[in-house]
Regions:
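Active-site loop of short-chain dehydrogenase/reductase
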Residues: 7, 62-63, 90-91, 136-150, ...
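The beta1-alpha1 cofactor-binding region of Rossmann-like NAD(H)/NADP(H)-dependent oxidoreductases
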Residues: 48, 68-80, 111
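Conserved glycine-rich cofactor-binding loop
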Residues: 15-16
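Substrate-binding pocket helix/loop in short-chain dehydrogenase/reductase
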Residues: 105-106, 110-115
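C-terminal helical subdomain
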Residues: 191-192, 209-292
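Conserved glycine-rich Rossmann-like NAD(P)H-binding loop of the short-chain dehydrogenase/reductase
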Residues: 29-52
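Catalytic loop of short-chain dehydrogenase/reductase
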Residues: 137-138, 142-184, 193-197, 208
């Protein structure tokens, strides 16, 4: 697998969870990582800040640049990108990980919450990618990665939480369009999504508490999958909507996924948006919805 040594990553929402796991995996290679996130001070319910994340990245072997940035704000994003380039000399990889979630139906979704999800998930992804693009075009193997789902248009993914689905699919539509647009520039644009729930604060605080955490995988599976994405040739590997374990199995040759499980005695819970025809690797069993009650 290609090393990310001396590569520069610009990652949104990397103060904790999936974004931090991706950053630390790159740091093990000796990468340089700009952490663009809002959490500068400790949160009562959420672990980690950009400063604690920076220390973890440095402890893992990387160089970290923590930047307070609201990705909905055009000026803040421009400053964050400019600071990254002036500090590290460029940007090789852009990871759009920041996301807002509210699993409410239409009547229960106030417009402030709707605007938050659209602003972070869709607009923020577009803005960050657009801002990084001039620098990515000068990189030797440039990648843009959205942490967003395959574009499976089945109504079941929309009926319970229309606003959230629109916002997440907005990220995926960026992949669809930008991959085609940037093909001539050799900039890869791909999406990565977990087959199962991932043990993050969103799962614990928003969705299912400690029980769902025990039925989840660790964020390291996405970190390993993202690292494998960045190892692919950007000129030819683009426009893909990847499911973590299938990609690791088919391209990375991974056959054992047990070490990613939080609790091996519990069934694995399926994530949203995974198409019905996407089958897990041999030996991986995913729980039915009825088993999650």
């Amino acid at each position: 697998m290609t090393s990310l040594k001396n590569k520069t990553l610009f990652i949104t929402g990397a103060s904790r969870g999936i974004g931090l796991a991706i950053a630390k995996r790159a740091a093990r290679d000796g990468a340089k990582v700009a952490i663009a996130a809002k959490t500068a001070e400790p949160h009562p319910k959420l672990e980690g800040t950009i400063h604690s994340a920076a220390k973890e990245i440095q402890d893992a072997g990387g160089i970290a640049l923590p930047i307070v940035c609201d990705i909905r704000d055009e000026e803040q994003v421009a400053r964050a990108v400019a600071l990254t380039v002036s500090t590290f000399g460029g940007i090789d990889i852009c990871v759009n990980n920041a996301s807002a979630i509210s699993l409410t139906n239409t009547g229960a979704t106030d417009m402030k919450r709707f605007d938050l999800m659209m602003g972070i998930n869709t607009r923020g992804t577009f803005l960050v990618t657009k801002s990084c693009l001039p620098h990515l075009k000068r990189a030797s193997n440039p990648h843009v990665l959205m942490m967003s789902p395959p574009l499976d248009m089945h109504p079941r993914w929309f009926g319970g939480h229309v606003a959230y689905s629109i916002a997440k699919y907005g990220m995926s539509l960026c992949v669809l369009g930008m991959a085609e647009e940037l093909k001539k520039d050799g900039v890869a644009v791909n999406a990565l999504w977990p087959r199962t729930t991932i043990a993050t604060s969103a799962i614990k605080n928003v969705l299912g508490g400690e029980k769902l955490i025990s039925m989840s995988r660790s964020a390291e599976i996405l970190a390993d999958a993202a690292h494998l994405v960045f190892s692919q040739p950007s000129k030819t590997f683009s426009g893909n909507f990847l499911i973590d374990d299938t990609f690791l199995h088919d391209v990375g040759g991974v056959t054992d996924f047990e070490h990613y499980r939080i609790d091996k005695t519990m069934p694995l819970a399926p994530d949203f948006f995974v198409p019905a025809d996407s089958k897990p690797p041999l030996g991986v069993k995913i729980a039915r919805i009825s088993e999650l009650a």
